[in-house]
Amino acid sequence: MVASARVQKLVRRYKLAIATALAILLLQGLVVWSFSGLEEDEPGEKGRQRKPRPLDPGEGSKDTDSSAGRRGSAGRRHGRWRGRAESPGVPVAKVVRAVTSRQRASRRVPPAPPPEAPGRQNLSGAAAGEALIGAPGFPQHGDTGSVEGAPQPTDNTFTPKCEIVGKDALSALARASTKQCQQEIANVVCLHQAGNLMPKSVPRHCQLAGKMSPGVQWEEIRAQQPVGGPPVRIAYMLVVHGRAIRQLKRLLKAVYHEQHFFYIHVDKRSNYLYREVVELAQHYENVRVTPWRMVTIWGGASLLRMYLRSMKDLLEIPGWTWDFFINLSATDYPTRTNEELVAFLSKNRDKNFLKSHGRDNSRFIKKQGLDRLFHECDSHMWRLGERQIPAGIVVDGGSDWFVLTRSFVEYVVYTDDPLVAQLRQFYTYTLLPAESFFHTVLENSPACASLVDNNLRVTNWNRKLGCKCQYKHIVDWCGCSPNDFKPQDFLRLQQVSRPTFFARKFESTVNQEVLEILDFHLYGSYPPSTPALKAYWENIYDVADGPGGLSDVLLTAYTAFARLSLRHAATAVSPLATAVCRFEPRGLPSSVHLYFYDDHFQGYLVTQAVQPSAQGPAETLEMWLMPQRSLKLLGHSDQASRLQSLEVGTEWDPKERLFRNFGGLLGPLDEPVAMQRWARGPNLTATVVWIDPTYVVATSYDITVDADTEVTQYKPPLSLPLRPGAWTVRLLQFWEPLGETRFLVLPLTFNRKLPLRKDDASWLHAGPPHNEYMEQSFQGLSGILNLPQAEALEEAARRHTELTGSALEAWTDGELSNFWSVAGLCAIGPSACPSLELCRLTSWSSLSPDPKSELGPVKADGRLR
């Protein structure tokens, strides 16, 4: 009775608050209902809205040698300003100060779609699932992984053929960005709900019970014994993407032999790499490029389709009589010589080498998502619901890097065995199908006894760093990726207990020294006078790609780099030579390269066509822009000495713990991250303060750094646009400085690839409304931080919002010159300017000699290296 009276009293006291809460809930319900349609995002959002994540939370971490980790854990929809505080692989940086995140309602699909309108055609021509049943495992018109590439144009409506009720399917329909993809998803789900998509059972032909897991040991003495019969010949399938042509050439140089065959598939999105590979292949009869290309996304069914089609090609190329199929990526490298590999495979010429996950099948099935239905479209793998594993077979899987015999490849490609046909159908709708398809087919086939549980690779797995759900933007699941090898990992490359012939991953932009060590271990050192052994170049823009791949920030920066360099050329020579060394840029830069030396980023190399101001023919110059160091380490105590570096950038890679935006170029609409590196030492709590160019304190937050923390990083949810100019990030302990760095928010001279107009500049360069970067104001800290009065800076910032044309370029160039310097210029051809050296004679130009990545003619021993 007393409790009831107390409840009534509380209700009377807080009835207004309760009524308000109920009203808010009602309003939220109306908002969610209003978003339940499938209309596209409004164009006024300028493309900055993010798609909602998968719906339910995940489970567990990843199995050995399998890339699937756990179910997508980003199911709850976060607002566009949601920040993160995390320290990959080390204790999490704890954000002590509260920051408010904004949330938007996610869209949903009505649970009962209307019936199909009479006479209306399916967007994909035929139901996606029906077409795939007719030809399982082969690309269909409009598939992401098909030769034709992106989905075909269609009308703006789609009509499900059934009532779609599963939450995964409804979530996928709400998030798919094209109507064709929505139609494909609906078709697949309806077929699955009707029981007409997945095989119920699959025949098993293996006469052995249970899982096959024999191993083969590496014996150095036995490997050197003579081989009975002719040595095996290998078909290497190189699956590549990106722009790292020099690393690909280095790999090909290491594995090449004239007795082997090399078939290269370049992702359809990697046009620069494709052009380079086509040119490379023209010089070697046993190197070919697939005449078709697919978009192969991580975890997608398109990767398996690509492998199956490549295998068929390799079987049908006249004169290519190979014995083993080995797939490699551009981030692989051999760990033993070709002679050792050929000798080993010749002794085991009837074996298929695939790495299995282990003994716990049920755990693997759950973590790999094999009991879930997936479909690939819009360059995304959509989770559509649950399914049953077919009865009658043993399901296996692990790594999607393998060594297969020709006879097994022929069986997979040509057989009409229901085992293969039905498993193709099953794996068409499977996440990471290449990690399980070949394992499962082999383990249930008549050749099951040929399985060896070893894929002859060593992979640099670091679960704490590699399993960060880094692929959740392209797949509704949490995946893992191996880390790059570094010199400290070299002992792992020298496997002695089991045969390993390849290792992954290697990235020259992350660490090239480990490749030098491995290359020396295999083939000996280059002559002492060999140039560029510690240098690495990687193209990031080529004029043949068109400006579409460039952001406004990069377009602004590259053109400004060219102007700065040409002014430098005109002022760096004697007065008598000034006239012939004065140039004007012609058009946009023709190429841009990243330049590294001794595993340190050295800057950008910009190639630009120019016209001499004096009479003379047009020339092409390459310009080296080097970043200027802006870090100051200020602390002297034991705790303060822990700070090693403080950086601000974008494209943070939690696996390798670096910024993939190597030059740190960012603009007003970017969302920067502050990262700190620490030495081991006593625990400490530090305060991070962000200050904009007009001394507005944008934000402040605390981070806790434990004794063994190595890296902390956090992206504050700042309101956009950021004010252009020089920003400062200070790191303090008890308000005493530990360190400070400056970074540039670049004023843009382009917007949507066109010169910036005044009406765009008025908001793009003005900073956030009312100078409020956060809902909470931190301007009260200006006194503690001893910030000066900023009236003059505020007035200058206001005037900058009115700039366009040459005045805007002058402001941009001035800001950029405070953070970048011209380190070199060279001429690609003859130049009238006497101070310009030929690029091929320099040590830094992208046109200078690079013997380690140059292929050359085949040697007498059949090799290139």
Swiss-Prot record:
Q: Where is this region: Disordered?
A: 39-155
In this UniProt entry, which cysteines form S-S bonds?
Answer: C162-C190, C206-C448, C467-C480, C469-C478, C581-C833, C826-C839
For this UniProt record, the keywords arranged alphabetically read as follows: Disulfide bond, Glycoprotein, Glycosyltransferase, Golgi apparatus, Magnesium, Manganese, Membrane, Metal-binding, Secreted, Signal-anchor, Transferase, Transmembrane, Transmembrane helix
Q: Which organism is it from?
A: Mus musculus
Q: Which gene encodes it?
A: Xylt2
| Role played | Catalyzes the first step in the biosynthesis of chondroitin sulfate, heparan sulfate and dermatan sulfate proteoglycans, such as DCN. Transfers D-xylose from UDP-D-xylose to specific serine residues of the core protein.
Which principal EC class is assigned to this enzyme? transferase
> Which residue windows are transmembrane per the record?
16-36
Q: How does this protein assemble?
A: Monomer.
Q: Which domain of life is it from?
A: Eukaryota
What is the recorded name of this protein? Xylosyltransferase 2
Catalytic reaction equation(s): UDP-alpha-D-xylose + L-seryl-[protein] = 3-O-(beta-D-xylosyl)-L-seryl-[protein] + UDP + H(+)
Query: Localized where?
Result: Golgi apparatus membrane; Secreted
